[in-house]
Amino acid sequence: MVKLGCSFSGKPGKEAGDQDGAAMDSVPLISPLDVSQLQPSFSDQVVINTQTEYQLTSADQPKKFADLEGQRLACSHSEEGRRLPTARMIAFAMALLGCVLIMYKAIWYDQFTCPDGFLLRHKICTPLTLEMYYTEMDPERHRSILAAIGAYPLSRKHGTEMPAVWGNNYRTAKEEHKGTTPAAMAVSTAAAAAAAEGTEPSGKSLDTREKEDPQKAEGVPSQPPK
């Protein structure tokens, strides 16, 4: 506490006129404080400290509850973390199996549908010989089966030619069939019947005809009638 009316000289019994004349002598000083006044009584503060401790514990309780919730969430996250790798592994296995099936369908299964000696190309079974023949050509033309068929050499003849004798007989029979008339058909029918009976159309037997014309029977043409 500050006590007024004190001076350096330590003489409190001066008059007011002397205080106005000597300003330095009237400067107040801070008196020393008693230590007992600075220390409060502990009897009332015990309850306050107890209440303060109780309030601090009550303030810490939500944090503890929050920690419990965090632990529960951490436990649940750990369980989910254990489940997620299993689901990912199953999904990865399914995707891998699908890729294997697609590759099997595209590479091997389609080739089994074509017979031996054929190869599936552009969803069409093409002969292996044709495929080998056109592998040396331009890949642009090789991609199209129609272009390959169009470029196939036409000089090759896929079949045996008919012999000349049989071809001539076939042509003659065809021409006779086209140019036959009812009368010619009747004559040819009678000649066929006579040949079956062993006689000529005139009614004579073949033996009688040979006796009358021995030269004709020997294969020498007879003289024409005059």
Swiss-Prot record:
Topology relative to the membrane: Single-pass membrane protein
Signal peptide coordinates: none
Membrane side Extracellular: residue ranges: 1-88
Residue spans crossing the bilayer: 89-109
Key words of the record: Cell membrane, Cytoplasmic vesicle, Endocytosis, Membrane, Transmembrane, Transmembrane helix
Annotated stretches, region: Disordered: 1-21, 177-226
Tissue spec: Most abundant in brain. Also expressed in testis and ovary and, at much lower levels, in kidney and heart.
A Pfam family per the record: Calcyon
Major localisation: membrane
Cytoplasmic side: 110-226
Compartmental location: Cytoplasmic vesicle membrane; Cell membrane
GO MF entries: clathrin light chain binding
General function of this protein: Interacts with clathrin light chain A and stimulates clathrin self-assembly and clathrin-mediated endocytosis.
InterPro entries in the record: NSG (IPR009431)
Subunit details: Interacts with CLTA.
Family from the record: Belongs to the NSG family.
Bias (Basic and acidic residues) ranges: 206-216
Record carries keyword tRNA processing: no
Species per Swiss-Prot/TrEMBL record: Mus musculus
UniProt key word Transmembrane: yes
Biased amino acid composition, Low complexity: 183-196
Annotated protein name in UniProt: Neuron-specific vesicular protein calcyon
Effects seen without this gene: Mice display impaired clathrin assembly and clathrin-mediated endocytosis. Transgenic mice with up-regulated forebrain expression of Caly display a range of abnormal behaviors including spontaneous hyperactivity, reduced anxiety and/or impaired harm avoidance.
Gene Ontology biological-process entries: clathrin coat assembly; positive regulation of endocytosis; postsynaptic neurotransmitter receptor internalization
